[in-house]
């Protein structure tokens, strides 16, 4: 009796979904407390003034204001939220 060995399965076909990382609020945009500014793996961007960092390195706004990015001499980029000047009443 002639036999043929069973064919092996393909070794490709494992591709993970995108994780939707990146900047969610760009420089100059107005944010409110709790708004996510950036989702990242590790600290591509560091938290500056009025910005918090979650356990997964997500940066979020602590106050209402305008998002700014500052590049420091040590090569790090800091994200801050500066309060919007209130209109005189």
From Swiss-Prot:
Region (Disordered): 1-21
One CC-aspect GO term: cytosolic large ribosomal subunit
Gene3D superfamilies per the UniProt record, alphabetical: 2.40.50.100
Record's keyword terms, sorted: Ribonucleoprotein, Ribosomal protein
The UniProt record lists the keyword Ribonucleoprotein: yes
InterPro entries: Ribosomal_bL27, Ribosomal_bL27_CS
UniProt keyword annotation of Ribonucleoprotein present: yes
GO biological process, one term: translation
One Gene Ontology molecular-function label: structural constituent of ribosome
Family, similarity comment: Belongs to the bacterial ribosomal protein bL27 family.
PANTHER family: LARGE RIBOSOMAL SUBUNIT PROTEIN BL27M, RIBOSOMAL PROTEIN L27
Family annotation (HAMAP family): Ribosomal_bL27 (MF_00539)
NCBIfam families: L27
Record protein name field: Large ribosomal subunit protein bL27
Organism from which the protein derives: Bradyrhizobium diazoefficiens (strain JCM 10833 / BCRC 13528 / IAM 13628 / NBRC 14792 / USDA 110)
Originating gene: rpmA
